[in-house]
Design a protein with these regions (language model features):
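Conserved class I S-adenosyl-L-methionine
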Residues: 1-43, 54, 78, 154, ...
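A generic alpha-to-beta junction signature in SAM-dependent methyltransferases
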Residues: 37-39, 60, 133, 184
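Class I SAM-dependent methyltransferase SAM/SAH-binding core
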Residues: 44-100, 124
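A short acidic, Gly/Pro-enriched loop at the edge of an enzyme's catalytic core
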Residues: 98-109
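A short SAM/SAH-binding and catalytic strip from SAM-dependent methyltransferases
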Residues: 109-122
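Conserved catalytic/acceptor-binding region of the Class I
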Residues: 123-124, 130, 134-203, 222, ...
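Conserved Class I S-adenosyl-L-methionine
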Residues: 172-265
């Protein structure tokens, strides 16, 4: 399925706000992925749904030759600015992970951190992963699990949001071992591990201020609502975190994620 209208909206939504503020809350995921993928000098590394470049920058500092692709033009522009400021050479491009304008077997490593999981056509995305990685090459993905804290946050948001188009895959299915095996098991030898990433802030209100200003899905949804409904969303958000995640005087949002490592057959 093409889902072109949804992806057009996603390309704007994900670029709505300074996403780099949110990537700072998943530093542990980026660090573990780059450590486990362990690039060698000159390895061709593709970072899919690269956002503002947090993973791409890490890979480039390790000596990889990095290409970063994201659906959102605004995120790519920020990523380019960040690379220039840091003196890093990274080839950033706007592109669709379901239909990449890249050669077969062009990359030693492909990564995505909480990124490709949001593409609606899971089978097309998995097919592109298998196509662009060379035989013996590696993939590394960090995907939020369906039982974890991010999925629960999105469930809290659901009553305020329009329904997804029919046939669009749930992003959190990418955090299910069974689903990932079904998508990638024929092409990759897989290793799957569950981990917990913690986001700690002083209060539910602080969490709201961060995500309603910087996280595309939350910011875009809030901006789409009238004043009364937006305040209902705001209050539901604060109550959700205060009721479920307050611990030792702060909000401790434990977010389970699935580390997917694979070697291309």
């Amino acid at each position: 399925m093409a889902f072109e209208e949804l992806k057009s909206k996603q390309s704007v939504m994900w670029g709505n706000g300074p996403y780099q503020n949110v990537t700072e809350t998943i530093v542990d995921i980026h660090d573990l992925l780059v450590d486990r993928l362990d690039p060698k000098e000159g390895d061709a590394w593709l970072d899919l749904a690269c956002g503002t470049g947090a993973m791409s920058e890490r890979a480039a500092r390790k000596g990889a030759s990095v290409t970063g692709v994201d659906l959102a033009p605004a995120l790519i522009e920020t990523a380019k600015e960040r690379a220039q400021q840091q003196g890093l050479t990274i080839d950033y491009r706007v592109g669709d992970c379901e239909n990449l304008a890249l050669d077969d077997g062009a990359f030693d490593i492909v990564s995505s951190t909480c990124g490709i999981m949001f593409a609606p056509d899971h089978e097309a995305t998995a097919g592109e992963l298998g196509r662009v990685v060379k035989s013996g090459g590696h993939i590394g993905l960090g995907n939020w699990t369906p039982e974890g804290g991010l999925a629960k946050m999105f469930a809290m948001m659901k009553p305020f949001a329009p329904p997804p188009p029919e046939g669009a895959g749930s992003p959190f299915s990418w955090g299910s071992e069974e689903h990932v095996q079904g998508l990638l098991g024929d092409s990759f030898d897989l290793s799957l591990e569950r981990h917990i990433s913690h986001l700690r802030v002083p209060s539910g209100e602080d969490y709201w201020q961060l995500f309603s200003s910087s996280y595309g899905p939350t910011k875009t949804l809030a901006e789409s609502l009238d004043d009364d409904r937006r305040e209902e969303f705001h209050q539901a958000w604060v109550d959700f975190f205060e009721s479920n995640y307050r611990s030792n005087g702060e909000i401790d949002h434990d977010r389970e994620w699935l580390l997917v490592l694979g070697t291309r057959r």
